[in-house]
């Protein structure tokens, strides 16, 4: 009798623990962040196609889309463009693009976006007309409030010298941020020296004209918008019950996937103090932006990794990044077919690489694990909503 009682107690404890685990999973807030990097957006495009494919298999639903699984999707520059593609609704109120459409999009439009060189030394390298034309044609009059999930797309206003973050949650207090997604796409990708800044206007709650003078979102968040995306999620937690589990910065209840566009292994070659002692403005201009972006991206990853590890939730954060780009693949604006094919190979090879030196788990395996969590969480939320 005592043995039977002990077994029953053990079974009860296991069931209680399992139930608690699944309840916790159902309350998790999920965030996807995509870096900037121009044509190198092909790399996260490959990763997203793999992830969405896994979700479709697990849920036996060919129409499953990333926006169905993530509470917040954020991006800057080319990552902002991808964010708009997978969150903007089509005529059937489903995402304009599936993840499998991302890479073909770059192959079709990339050569035109990066082919209209102005040839001016004292002006932007490209005129930006095609970069503006494509979002206008594809996304039309769709605005931020219509996004199928929360978004976090960054830009920088050169007139006010302030970052501008386009999110659905800000619209109640700042309705002027309800801009057209096509304007946002150009603005977040308008990298200084590459494309002209973008001007457009919206209306305030009083009907007054509100003007924007915007450039690339990387100026506001540098290339990695992961912290921005998490910040948007935590701010929503104060008002939205669906985000309540991450109030007070409870990162244990946060599932974060951050996708990079690759770093330049050649740039990782060090410079000595003696070598740079006589550098002038021109020499520093050639490397200072890369240094700043690389350092900021590294520190963002370092901070997030540290926070999740300290909370014993390191499996809740995955940074997918290729750190050994070489040759033409390092260039944000080389949209030649040969280079784009190389970027596809980089993305496909990255899936087979280990997540870290200390772990045998590959990115492919880690993404499958993430997909399982996303799938289970979605089912739990759906079941809860049905009661």
Curated annotation (Swiss-Prot):
Keywords: Coiled coil, Glycoprotein, Hydrolase, Lipid degradation, Lipid metabolism, Plant defense, Signal, Storage protein, Vacuole. Glycans are attached at residues 115, 203. Residues 1-23 form the signal peptide. GO terms for biological process: defense response; lipid catabolic process. GO terms for molecular function: monoacylglycerol lipase activity; nutrient reservoir activity; phospholipase activity. Tuber. The keyword Signal applies. It is an enzyme of class 3 (hydrolase). Its EC number is 3.1.1.-. It is found in: Vacuole. A motif (GXGXXG) lies at residues 36-41. The active site is at residues 77, 216. It holds the Pfam family Patatin. A motif (GXSXG) lies at residues 75-79. A motif (DGA/G) lies at residues 216-218. Its main location: other. One of its GO terms (cellular component) is vacuole. Residues 32-230 form the PNPLA domain. The keyword Signal applies. Patatin have a dual role as a somatic storage protein and as an enzyme involved in host resistance. Probable lipolytic acyl hydrolase (LAH), an activity which is thought to be involved in the response of tubers to pathogens. Belongs to the patatin family. This is Patatin-13.
């Amino acid at each position: 009798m005592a043995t039977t009682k002990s077994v029953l107690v053990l079974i009860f404890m296991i069931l209680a623990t399992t139930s608690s685990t699944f309840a916790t999973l159902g309350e998790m807030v999920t965030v996807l962040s995509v870096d900037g990097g121009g044509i190198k957006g092909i790399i996260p495009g490959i990763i997203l196609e793999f992830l969405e494919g896994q979700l479709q298999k697990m849920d036996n639903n060919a129409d499953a889309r990333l926006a169905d699984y993530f509470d917040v999707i954020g991006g800057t520059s080319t990552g902002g463009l991808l964010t708009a593609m997978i969150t903007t609704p089509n005529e059937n109120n489903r995402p304009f693009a599936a993840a499998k459409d991302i890479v073909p999009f770059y192959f079709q439009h990339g050569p035109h976006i990066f082919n209209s060189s102005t040839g001016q030394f004292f002006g932007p390298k490209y005129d930006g007309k095609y970069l503006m034309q494509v979002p206008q044609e594809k996304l039309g009059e769709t605005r931020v409030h219509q996004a199928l999930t929360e978004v976090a797309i960054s830009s920088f206003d050169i007139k006010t010298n302030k970052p501008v973050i386009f999110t659905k949650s800000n619209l109640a207090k700042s309705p002027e941020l309800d801009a057209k997604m096509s304007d946002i796409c150009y603005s977040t990708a308008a990298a200084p020296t590459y494309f002209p800044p973008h001007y457009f206007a919206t209306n305030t709650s009083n009907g007054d004209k509100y003007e924007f003078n915007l450039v690339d979102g990387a100026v506001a968040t540098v290339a990695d918008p992961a912290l921005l995306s998490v910040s948007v999620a935590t701010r929503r937690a104060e008002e939205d019950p669906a985000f309540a589990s991450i109030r007070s910065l409870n990162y244990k209840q946060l599932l974060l996937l951050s996708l990079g566009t690759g770093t330049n292994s050649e740039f990782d070659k060090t410079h000595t103090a003696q070598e740079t002692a006589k550098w002038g403005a021109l020499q520093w201009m050639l490397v200072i932006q890369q240094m700043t972006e690389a350092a900021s991206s590294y520190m963002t990853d370092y901070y997030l990794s540290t926070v999740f590890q300290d909370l014993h939730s390191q499996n809740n954060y995955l940074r997918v990044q290729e750190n050994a780009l070489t040759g033409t693949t390092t260039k944000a604006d080389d949209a030649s077919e040969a280079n784009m094919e190389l970027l596809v190979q980089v993305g496909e090879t990255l899936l087979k690489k280990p997540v870290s030196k200390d772990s045998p788990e590959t990115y492919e395996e880690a993404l499958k694990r993430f997909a399982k969590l996303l799938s289970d969480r979605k089912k739990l939320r759906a079941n809860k909503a049905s009661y």
